[in-house]
Amino acid sequence: VVEIVVTGPASPALASLEDLAGQEVHVRRSSSYYDSLSRLNRRFRGLGKPEMKLTLVPEALEDEDMMDMVGVGLLKIIVVDDWKAELWAGLLSKIKPRPDLALSEPSDIAWAFRKGSPKLAHMRNTESNAVAPNTCRPKRPQPGLGL
């Protein structure tokens, strides 16, 4: 998983992460994205560049809500996990995931569940094995899913 910038129709042109200097970015305070953006702001400060304006959004807003808002031009710049941005870009045609503007290094995510749950482990592992690595797509087309 990589944290990437997502833009839309109201977004400014961004050629590199440095172009985020002085820009407004909407983010939830509790998210890992906030930490990554704060780290980038410290770098900007050290380089004598203007910091990004980190505008906090309500904690009730999910990444999907914010991507929808970017798509209709209510928000200009957000940060989302790459897999989620790519998945939703297929549904929200006006958002633009920007893997070229990555705020984090690749990392892994995993499921955690109670020890001694063999049925849950089997179900989760079977489902995980049906998805191609590093994608949100099934390894083989699933009838009726349109994938």
Where are the regions that the model predicts?
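Proline/Glycine/Serine-rich low-complexity intrinsically disordered segments
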Residues: 1-147
